[in-house]
Each structure stands twice: as C-alpha cells, then as structure tokens.
Amino acid sequence: MITFLLNQEIRREDNLSPNMTVLNYLRTKVNKTGTKEGCGSGDCGACTVVLGEVVDGQLQYRSVNSCLTFVSALHGKQLITVEDLQNRDRSLHPVQKAVVDFHGSQCGYCTPGFIMSMFALGKNKPDASKEDVMESLAGNLCRCTGYRPIVDAAMSLSTDQPLIDQFAELERNTIKKLESIQDTEANLRLGHLTAFSPKSTDELAKLFQAHPNAKLVAGGTDLALEVTQFHREIETLISVNLVEDMKVCKETDTDLIIGANLPISDSYSLLKKHYPDFGELLHRFASLQVRNQGTIGGNVANASPIGDTPPLLIALDAKIKLRCGDESRTMPIEDYFISYKVTAQKESEFIEQIIIPKPTNDSFRAYKVSKRLDDDISAVCGAFDIQIEDGKVSYARIAFGGMAATPKRATRCENTLLGKPWTDANIKLAMQELYNDFEPLSDFRASQEYRSLSAANMLRRYFIERQNKNNQIETRVTSYV
C-alpha cells in the first residue's frame, strides 16, 4: 500500500500495478484528465504535475513528468494537478489568470503542463528572473502559440513577495498530513508484480540480495521508458526514492560526495560552486522536470555511451562507492564501464555514492554538442582537465561520450600532450590522435565524421579558451524569446 496526498485528500492505494505511471493513475483512476500525454517520454512537458514533500520541516515543490513517474514514487508526498489550482470559490489561480491575460494558450493541449511548471516556479522562486523562467519552461513544448506570451505571463508573476494562494494558506496543515503518513507501508503488489520501497541503505542491500533480478529505480526517467515506450512488464521494482541516506550532498577537505539517490537539481549548487562547467552542463541535462527526478547515480548506472555526466566524472578522476550486502568497495569510474551497457557491477550490487576530487585549479571544462540547446541528448560530450606548468602539459585527462560504446578516455591524445609545450602545433597533433582514440558510429544524431570533427574542435576550443582567459566570447545562446 502507498499513502499520499492528492491535493489535500489522503489517499491509500493498494490495488495499483507497480508499473503504473502517475499519468495513467490520474487519467484512469481518479478522472483527472487535465494532465495530458504528448510524448510519453519526458520530452514535451504536457504531463507536468507538481509533487510537494517535507524537507527539513519545510514544504518543497518540484515539477515532474507524470509519464515517467511510477506511482510508488508518490508515497509520503503531495500530488498537485492543474485541476487543483482552481480556488475554492472557483476563481482562477494567479498562474492560470496570467496565462489567460497574456494570451498564452491556443489549442490548449500543452497549457496544463506550462501552468504547472509556472506554479512550481512561483512557489520556489517568486522573484524569478527571465533566466529562471526560461529554465523552468525549457521542458515544456508548444507548437502553436509561440513562447513569448507564455514567458510574458510567467514574468508578470515575478515579485519580491511569496505567491499567496490556497496552498500557502494550507501549508501548515499540509505539512502535518504529510508527516503523519511518512512511516506507513510503502510497498505495492498486484498479482505477480511487486514494488518495494526500502527506507535505508541497509534495508535496500538486504532486499536486493533477496531479489537480485529486481530493477532498481530512483527517478525512473530512463527505466520508465521500458513501460511507456517499449510496453515491457517489470516484475520486481525496488524504488530507492525513500532511502534518505543516499541523498547526501556534501564536501570534505578533499572530495565532493554525491549520493546516488540525490536528484540532479539538488546537486547543482555544490557542483557549480567547484566546477562551473559541470553546473553549466547540468543546466542542459534534459529538462528541469527530469532533473528534479533523475540522479547522477542513475545516469552512471544506465551506462549509456551518450550519458552526459560520465565523461565529466571520468575527466575529473571521480570514483564510485558500490555496496553489496554488508560489503562496500570503491573504484575509479572509468573502470566501471566495460562495454556497451555492460558494467563492473556485480549481482545485487548498487551504486551508493559518487566521489569527486575537489579542484586544485580552474583547468576543467566541459562541452556538449546537440541539436537543441535544452532538453536534448548529446551527439558528442567532451570533458577536459589539462594542467600546465612552466609552459608544458603536466597533467591531462580527456574523456568523451558519444564516441565509443562506452564513455571513454582519449589516452592517445593525452599522451601526445603530456610533457609537451602548450602550443598550437602540439594541439593540432593531439587533435589528430583523437582519430586513433575513437571510431565512432554514424546514427540519426550524427555521422562518424561529424563526431570525430566535433571532438577535435572541442579540444581546440579548450586550448583557445585557456589561452584567452581574459577575453572570452560568450557562445551560449541563452534565450529564444
């Protein structure tokens, strides 16, 4: 049974398929059809809803894609849909009124998703800047209205005062309700399908040993596609959503520690503080809805050759802490990837933490090439950490995604640079060595030639930026409206 708040109503559900998404639950079980399905893969945002949860005694709101969220993730949270925004006197919520006033809807299919993203933004950042608005809406697509009136509507809500609505008035009562259901059972069973929701790392380790064929799910932003896109049945799920000790985000004297269950959006501040380019890339990692659910641990465990974070972690010489039963081990992340979608992870073993060395200088850079600026998969992702002493390369770690069957270091390129003067001529030699490091495939995202040339040009860009630290040109397009 799972227990959660549907707006202000406590719901206890024990007859749901563990494979059911929140979108299907809303539309087929409780007749809340305002939430739409556009793509079923987390790309369009039409299905956006907002989840509220108690964090350190405060109510925190997150926009999420309901098409990628399994119902087990609702336990202990508040689920808010576009229908719930209407005031008790049936008047429009301030967000809804703004969209009407600024003519931000035409066919209306995408409008509920936009409104929920704007609602979450208003709750989290009432004084939102245009950059905040663009980030919040980057995961919502509109094919007929055009974005300017929608952005104008969102900007009209920006104020230095908290958003006052019925949710603000009921906040203390909502927190009490959520706190009252935290310790209730959180497992789901329907026929031969089961979803377990352990609440500690120790409990997770025991469960995974008892069910070694189970699928672990954190945010579910990738695993849910097996259900929504490929119509597969997942017999046993183990959700780590409630494992709070895997949501650590801290720094020691030497390292940054990121829990494998920490949402990407929660890791942003720490990573941006120490590695600005890492933070910049996370802004381009899918959409805010996906970042509010997905985790770096999941991005690593997925072992995709085009995952955005593994090349960066490899270039930074990061390590991962793995747990199996009562035993733990730590390994360099570059050793984790064996071949396409094959890792060094043993049966019943899972990633517990990602450990990133703190920087000793500002030599790290990361670049991503994709067809869209926001919410798109990489054609090539490159990460560089090259250190120069007395005009010569003393240290070099270069890694790419999208260039091989796994995220991989460019060792020939590195060796060409090590000990050599940091010059244009040597950079050109190293660029040529990248063609020996990798033989990328051609697919619908990019050809082999395009990938190879892009990777080489990333190295050249890195060289130019390092040579011209005080005269950098901004190449990022920050707004379309």
Question: What name fits each language-model region?
Answer:
Residues M1-T3, A396:
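Extreme N-terminal starter segment of soluble prokaryotic enzymes
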Residues L5-R12, V50-E53:
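Short strand-turn-strand beta-turns centered on an Asx-Gly dipeptide
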Residues I10-V30, L74-P94, P112-K130:
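Short, charged low-complexity linear segments at domain edges
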Residues P18-V49:
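A basic, amphipathic helix-loop patch mediating RNA/tRNA/ribosome contacts
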Residues C39, C44-C47, C67, C107-C110, ...:
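Disulfide-bonded cysteines in secreted/extracellular proteins and peptides
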Residues V50-V54, S63-S66, P94-V100, G104, ...:
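C-terminal structural segment of proteins
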Residues L51-V82:
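S4-like RNA-binding module at protein N-termini
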